Amino acid sequence: MASSTAQSKKQFKRSMTKKSHSWWWDSHNCPKNSKWLAENLEKMDDRVNHMLKLIEEDADSFAKKAQMYFQKRPELIQLVEEFYRMYRALAERYDQASGELQKNHTSEIQSQSSLEISSPTKEKLSRRQSSHKEEEDSSSLTDSGSDSDHSSANDEDGDEALIRRMAELELELQETKQKLLLQQESVDGDNNVDLLHKITTYEGELKEANEKMRMHEDEIANLKNQLQSFMSFDTEDHLGAEQKSVDLDKEDTKEDAVATKVLALEEELSIAKEKLQHFEKETYSLKNELEIGKAAEEKLKSLQHELELAQRDADTYINKLNAEKKEVLKLQERLAMVKTSLQDRDNEIRALKTAVSDAEQKIFPEKAQIKGEMSKMLEERSQLGEQLRELESHIRLIKEEKAETEEKLRGGTEKISGMRDESNVLREEIGKREEKIKETEKHMEELHMEQVRLRRRSSELTEEVERTRVSASEMAEQKREAIRQLCMSLDHYRDGYDRLWRVVAGHKSKRVVVLST
């Protein structure tokens, strides 16, 4: 394993030094018009290099362990090539467009500056003085409105960004859900099923939270519009009736209280948004833990498969060794039988020789027959000797095969022990992962409780917003009634003033007539 990894690293270094990739964008110039684009391109190059390093460095070892990776490796490299080409072409086009825009922008600025220099300075001064007076006159009326508009614009921008982020997270959750469903078809794990079910439940809860957040944002926007209308209405009242300012200050304090309530509601909404972002981070970390656990389970399954294959090989070697041992025992028994038969033949030959030597003198005619029997026995002895040598050579071959099988068996046992150690380590790691998953599940339950509390708080906030809306409507009705009374009093005062003016005019005319007479 170490030699294979070292060879793969050497091959990767050679390939990186030679730059064997024909699709690499060597001729591309570094963009000078955008610093952000240059930094992103450098990061993209580093990431693509790292991805290719991961693909090519471990390709040999992974191909030995799994043929599927070896089949998908060229497809992955092709995808990286297409991605890299598209990104570099887009970057080049963006660089050209940004350069053209900068040139056009500088030319427009120069033309505008020339036009502004040619205009007289007196008009500028008069305009500035008039605008300054108008700003001083309207500053007391528009400070609160401008501040509220600015804060509402910032809040709306933040809410739109948050809504976009929520939509992106929903899409990511759907993609991860599809990936997990595809992986679940090939992997049977109860923990993964539970985690997938929890992720779906969290996705539904996230959708509900998004809907509630949107409802709260709509209500807050309506309240802001009502406040702006009230404030504009207050400015009209202030210009139309200065005598009732003391009575309307109380209503302004009420409006300030409503505004503070709305700000408190916005703070609660921002806290809920922060907790929602924290919840999204937790779901992302849970997905990462799930992917790591699945990779560990797949590795453990592959190791178990290799362990089973090695165990089968070891069983076959053991069976073969037992059969060879039985054959050796049979041959040894046969050799012992041959040796005993040879000893018996030798004893018979000696007995026959003694009998021949004794019978030569006594029975001369039977000498030829005895010599023939002796020659036959010698031939049989030579044949038995040849059989004995053949059996000894066969026993030597069997012993050599036995030694080879024992060495293979020792190597297989060492490999099995190593695989068992690795499987034990993986089991421990899986146990740790399961404990961590349990902790994350517990944390998810706590987050669920927190989400329930936030839902209750959101319902309370909706009720509070409804109450503020009702109070705002009541305040508007009170303002309308006050304006009606003010208009009636103004009409009454105008009628009295007209009557008084007529009486005074009549007296003046009578005095003139008397003086003339």
UniProtKB/Swiss-Prot annotation:
Family (UniProt): Belongs to the NET family.
Coiled coil segments of this chain: 156-486
Organism this protein belongs to: Arabidopsis thaliana
Name listed for the protein in its UniProt record: Protein NETWORKED 4B
Record gene name: NET4B
The keyword Coiled coil appears for this protein: yes
Function of the protein: Plant-specific actin binding protein. May be part of a membrane-cytoskeletal adapter complex.
Recorded superkingdom: Eukaryota
GO cellular component, one term: membrane
